[in-house]
């Protein structure tokens, strides 16, 4: 019985150590979500004309914390842009973390 308990504790510990933590982003899931972002953020030198003309930032290589904070601010209304507010409203905290992990891991060269 004692041997079985030790094995169970060992197996659970190994599982918990290898599993991603809550709130950590998964770049693979982020890649899938990022396909909706590519239409604007994936075009070099793209400028939007709505609601005003300005250059759309490239996201590859951005700090994960910056991306999460920006998306949270769009979702809360602290940052204003109609398209981004609408998109951020559909994202969960995990979606934001996944997107941030993907873009954080994307090389700066991919931003050019």
Residue ranges and their predicted role:
Residues 1-9:
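Bacterial N-terminal signal peptides that target proteins for export
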Residues 14, 18-20:
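N-terminal signal peptide c-region/cleavage motif recognized by signal peptidases
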Residues 24-48:
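Sequence/structural segment immediately N-terminal to covalent heme-attachment motifs in c-type
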Residues 29, 66, 83-86, 98:
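Extracytoplasmic/secreted proteins, especially bacterial periplasmic and envelope-associated proteins
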Residues 49-55:
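Short cysteine/histidine-rich zinc-coordinating motifs and their immediately flanking basic loops
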Residues 56-58, 68-75, 86-89:
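A structural feature that tracks compact, well-ordered secondary-structure segments
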Residues 76-79, 87-112:
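C-terminal capping alpha-helices of c-type cytochrome domains
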